[in-house]
């Protein structure tokens, strides 16, 4: 998949602006200097670390940067209080974390498995 992405980036003339990093996410995020800003991040990884990814990215997010998070509705399981497996609880906690975060604006879309688009408040 990365080869296909690289081809499209090159065709669009943005290949010099995108850094593709394939490594454990938290480890990689911790290596990015605090001063280096991230314009866009897409979170779709182990659900138990969603809050950790979010906070690590937020600290490096540019003024108009966006964080897009996948699986926030988890096939509707997050609203069913009788479902309490580890991933469902983690996503529920993440959604509550973002809801309570006064630093951001968030729109949750019911596309697919649910996607949140999060922007740092101006």
Predicted regions and their residues:
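S-adenosylmethionine/decaboxylated-SAM
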Residues: 1-122
